[in-house]
Amino acid sequence: MSKLKEYRVNRQIRAKECRLIDENGQQIGIVPIEEALKIAEEKGLDLVEIAPQAKPPVCKIMDYGKFKYELKKKEREARKKQREHQIEVKDIRMKVRIDEHDLQVKLKHMREFLEEGDKVKVWLRFRGRENIYPELGKKLAERIINELSDIAEVEVQPKKEGNFMIFVLAPKRKK
């Protein structure tokens, strides 16, 4: 978790005077710190130094506990939003001579990943003599692409690399 900025509150404020803003956001003007503290105390709120670098520093009358809570809430929302937008690439590996039921299970997993917005990298593995029949891999790749064509588009075309044929599917963009 990131560290929230610490603000000086009430008696922690060291300035002699400040530019005061009330709880409604109205600027009151430049007043001595003691007077600002008195006004805040009368209203049952805190005096918070929100811009210490300004000359004179800017202080606002507010409920500091509520202010900190709102800041934490905004930070949580920002982190959540950031997490939602991360696209992962999920790997699915299978043999070229995969059984029908196993293929259906793999297709189901790929469909779930694509519906969640993730990309899917498919690795078709060739073993032994299968290497001399790359058309087996091409057929399987075409079948997978056709089965998922309603929700996915090919981002990287099927390509043979060593003992694997690799291609990447991405979720279709919403219009």
From Swiss-Prot:
Domain of life: Bacteria
Molecular function terms from GO: ribosome binding; translation initiation factor activity
Transmembrane spans: none
Localization per Swiss-Prot or TrEMBL: Cytoplasm
GO biological process, one term: ribosome disassembly
Family (UniProt): Belongs to the IF-3 family.
Subunit structure as annotated in this protein's UniProt entry: Monomer.
Protein name per Swiss-Prot or TrEMBL: Translation initiation factor IF-3
Organism: Aquifex aeolicus (strain VF5)
Lineage: Bacteria, Pseudomonadati, Aquificota, Aquificia, Aquificales
